[in-house]
Amino acid sequence: CAKHSETCKNGNCCTCTQYRGKDEPMACRRGTHGQRCQCVMKIMKH
């Protein structure tokens, strides 16, 4: 599957840990470099 910030197509994104602790597929968003997988409400690790 495609990781965060990698090019995505046909919903091939990896899952991403959400703030509620559930794993959900990343959203495929169109950006300046084409469509990329993006975690929505990704848990930030410092």
UniProtKB/Swiss-Prot annotation:
Keywords, sorted A to Z: Disulfide bond, Neurotoxin, Secreted, Toxin
Reported function: Potent toxin that may paralyze and/or kill insect pests such as H.virescens (lepidoptera), S.exigua (beet armyworm) and M.sexta (tobacco hornworm).
GO cellular component, one term: extracellular region
Tissue: Expressed by the venom gland.
Molecular function terms, GO-annotated: toxin activity
Protein name (database record): U2-plectoxin-Pt1a
Localization terms from the record: Secreted
Primary location class: secreted
Modification(s) after translation: Contains 4 disulfide bonds.
